[in-house]
């Protein structure tokens, strides 16, 4: 719908007029004619030229003195044009030009006037010759006498003033024009125009800021409500997975739409929902869907918007937010990244009473204080529920705390299906397989996988998104883009291949509940290669044997290097593997109770969110117990490392096969790994199968024409495929018969030769 243009306000018109006035004044000052300057020698030459001129083409219209500014101002006729200029001269020169008699005129000047010129005794007479003929000496004398009379009236009675006294007193003496005097406009109004315009502009600016202040914002009221009222087009159908979370929030939305239904049953709806969980799981998306479903005023604000420069701003913004929400009740308030103001009180820089705590205290009062908040639903979202203040989490404020966790395999498939809409994906790809290969991925990461695969399809100019592009997209999300141009020596490349093959052999043979899905020696990020090991089934608990097998798999790379190159030639490539193995071993001893020390938790999470997570970790046990913990961790790592060495030595042939295949292909996948394990032979050249560049037409037709039409069309495609397969079988049989015939003929020929 076309929006109506907003009518300009009176203040806008005033601002435009002020700006036009300033611009006009600047242009007037810039374009107004100004007197130029000439030197005294040039002026003397012009005086002589005009004095000896026999025509009226060169003469002075005006020749005036301004002793107070030491200026001689001239208006001169030069041919067909009139020039105006001024000359800077000291009082001595000016008095010389003014004097009627006296003064020395050089012979050079007199010779330049010519013999036909009248005899002159002063510069004043020469200037008279150079002026217009009608300006006689009598007119000039009367002008001087008038100046004298004006001076006498100023001095007072009983005083005598002579002509020479007036000249020496630096009073202006004008030959044929008076010194110009400005009128009232130019003398009193024009000089003050810039000041008036700037004053008007300042008044207008102050007026506008005051208006903003009255409206609740601007410079004079920084405590304005920063919340944004949004209208979202998202629905719960746009949120894949998180069925339980959507069910909980849908109950709140239904209450806002039908409060009487719950009031009749005597039910009190919870006042707030806290959405927690890892990043990228859809907390903000759920809030957008809630805004789209509720059809009530929805106020969105980030918690960081409350606390800014001025003291007390945060508390005031909280009051303004709830005041506006109460005025439009029923309403929803969504505060994103709540931990920015909701952290536990009593800690932090500035002691226990800083600006953030004032804001939190005001939020606690507004959520459940003396003023009733009936009809207001508060939704908070954060990734750090562990650092929130306990008073914020109690019933009556956030009654329900919902963890939006990482999606399971079924939810991942739903999320992939949602993001795959409108994308041309190869028919050979199933979203279920992608979901299996992406355990631990959040919804944001799954969306990124589909988007990266689409970008790769556009880059490579393929008709559909292929399985290879999906693989590359998953790798990009996990480790970043491949560094194909990295220069690496053949020896180092071989060592990396042995390292990754060692991981794979241990992971395959120990049966730790994971499958080696992919091995690559293509460098990505800070790694020279990696193994993608995924669990066979979705599990939320791990056994001791599985953890030990995982540690052994991590140590497999270092074990392979030691077996092939010796202890003195092992590389730094196992640094990250050792770090991960050590973390698992430490947790087995200190948290899981899987050691000889018994089922005791030695490391409690007493860490401070302000001083660092590991600051107080080792404060709950003695140094002797710490030494015993280190011994147990060392024992777990050492035994797992020995197990990895024994496994690789037992299956040395598989290690060499995987290494050779990696050097040849750089990347091998699960099916190829399985074939190497089962046959213990190199892969045949024909295992590289090109994927069909075929669009999954059924999904597209189902979206456009309906499921019945899509099913019928698919059946027709299947019949065509069966007919094509029959033709191929007939051709194959004919080819076989031809081959048999050729074989028999060759046998006959060979027998003949014998």
Swiss-Prot record:
Its cofactor is Zn(2+). It is an enzyme of class 3 (hydrolase). InterPro entries: AAA+_ATPase, AAA_lid_3, ATP-dep_Zn_Metalloprotease, ATPase_AAA_core, ATPase_AAA_CS, FtsH, P-loop_NTPase, Peptidase_M41. GO terms for biological process: protein catabolic process; proteolysis. Its main location: membrane. Residues 1-9, 208-754 are cytoplasmic. Binds 1 zinc ion per subunit. One of its GO terms (cellular component) is plasma membrane. GO terms for molecular function: ATP binding; ATP hydrolysis activity; ATP-dependent peptidase activity; metalloendopeptidase activity; zinc ion binding. The chain crosses the membrane at residues 10-30, 187-207. The active site is at residue 500. Residues 31-186 are extracellular. Acts as a processive, ATP-dependent zinc metallopeptidase for both cytoplasmic and membrane proteins. Plays a role in the quality control of integral membrane proteins. This is ATP-dependent zinc metalloprotease FtsH.
């Amino acid at each position: 719908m076309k929006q109506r243009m907003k009518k300009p306000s009176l203040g806008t018109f005033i601002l435009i007029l002020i700006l036009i006035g300033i611009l006009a004044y600047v242009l007037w000052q810039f374009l107004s004619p100004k007197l130029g300057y000439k030197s005294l020698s040039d002026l003397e030459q012009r005086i002589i030229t005009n004095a000896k001129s026999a025509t009226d083409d060169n003469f002075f219209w005006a020749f005036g003195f301004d002793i107070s500014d030491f200026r001689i101002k001239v208006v001169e006729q030069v041919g067909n044009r009139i020039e105006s200029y001024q000359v800077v001269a000291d009082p001595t020169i000016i008095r010389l030009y003014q004097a009627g008699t006296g003064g020395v005129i050089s012979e050079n000047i007199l010779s330049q006037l010519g013999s036909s010129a009248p005899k002159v005794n002063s510069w004043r007479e020469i200037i008279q010759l150079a002026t217009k003929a009608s300006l006689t000496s009598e007119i000039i004398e009367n002008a001087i006498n008038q100046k004298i009379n004006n001076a006498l009236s100023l001095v007072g009675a009983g005083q005598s003033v002579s002509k020479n006294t007036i000249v020496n007193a630096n009073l202006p003496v004008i030959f044929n024009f008076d010194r110009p005097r400005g009128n009232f406009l130019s003398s009193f109004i024009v000089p003050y125009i810039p000041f008036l315009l700037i004053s008007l502009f300042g008044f207008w600016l102050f007026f506008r800021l005051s208006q903003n202040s009255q409206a609740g914002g601007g410079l004079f009221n920084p405590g304005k409500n920063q919340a944004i009222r949004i209208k979202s087009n998202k629905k719960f159908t746009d949120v894949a997975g998180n069925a339980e979370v959507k069910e909980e929030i849908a109950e709140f939305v239904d209450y806002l739409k039908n409060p009487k239904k719950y009031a009749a049953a005597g039910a009190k709806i919870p006042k707030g929902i806290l959405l927690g969980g890892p990043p990228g799981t859809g907390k903000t998306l759920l809030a957008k869907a809630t805004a789209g479903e509720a059809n009530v005023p929805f106020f969105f604000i980030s918690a960081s918007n409350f606390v800014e420069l001025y003291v007390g701003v945060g508390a005031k913004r909280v009051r303004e937010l709830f005041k506006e929400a109460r005025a439009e009740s029923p309403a929803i308030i969504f505060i994103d990244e709540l931990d920015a103001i909701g952290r536990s009180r009593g800690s932090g820089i500035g002691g226990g009473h800083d600006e953030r705590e004032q804001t939190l205290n005001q939020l606690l009062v507004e959520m459940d204080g003396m003023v009733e908040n009936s009809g207001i639903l508060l939704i908070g979202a954060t990734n750090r529920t562990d650092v929130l203040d306990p008073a914020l989490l109690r019933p009556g404020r956030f009654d329900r705390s919902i963890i939006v966790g990482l999606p399971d395999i079924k939810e991942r498939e739903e999320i992939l299906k949602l993001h795959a809409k409108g994308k041309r994906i190869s028919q050979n790809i199933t979203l279920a397989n992608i979901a299996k290969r992406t355990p631990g991925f959040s919804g944001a990461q799954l969306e990124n996988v589909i988007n990266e695969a689409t970008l790769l399809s556009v880059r490579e100019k393929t008709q559909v998104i292929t399985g290879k592009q999906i693989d590359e997209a998953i790798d990009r999300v996990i480790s970043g883009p491949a560094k194909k141009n990295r220069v690496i020596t053949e020896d180092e490349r071989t060592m990396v291949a042995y390292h990754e093959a060692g991981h794979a052999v241990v992971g395959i043979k120990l049966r730790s509940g994971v499958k080696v899905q992919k091995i690559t020696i293509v460098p990505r990020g800070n790694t020279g290669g990696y193994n993608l090991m995924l669990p066979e089934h979705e599990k939320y608990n791990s056994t001791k044997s599985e953890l030990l097998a995982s540690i052994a798999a991590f140590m497999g790379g270092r074990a392979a290097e030691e077996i092939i190159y010796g202890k003195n030639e092992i590389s730094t490539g196992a640094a990250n593997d050792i770090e991960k193995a050590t973390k698992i071993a430490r947790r087995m001893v200190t948290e899981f109770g899987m050691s000889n020390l018994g089922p005791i938790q030695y490391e409690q999470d007493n860490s401070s969110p302000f001083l660092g997570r590991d600051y107080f970790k080792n404060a709950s046990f003695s140094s002797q117990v710490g030494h015993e913990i280190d011994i147990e961790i060392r024992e777990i790592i050492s035994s797992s490392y020995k197990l990895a060495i024994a496994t690789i030595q037992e299956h040395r042939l598989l290690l060499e096969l995987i290494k050779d295949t990696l050097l040849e292909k750089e990347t091998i996948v699960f099916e190829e790994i399985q074939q190497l394990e089962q046959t213990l032979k190199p892969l045949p050249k024909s295992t590289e199968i090109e994927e069909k560049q075929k669009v999954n037409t059924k999904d597209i037709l189902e979206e456009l024409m309906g499921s019945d039409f899509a099913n019928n069309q698919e059946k027709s495609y299947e019949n065509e495929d069966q007919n094509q397969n029959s033709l191929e079988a007939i051709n194959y049989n004919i080819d076989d018969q031809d081959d048999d015939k050729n074989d028999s003929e060759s046998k006959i020929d060979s027998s003949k030769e014998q």
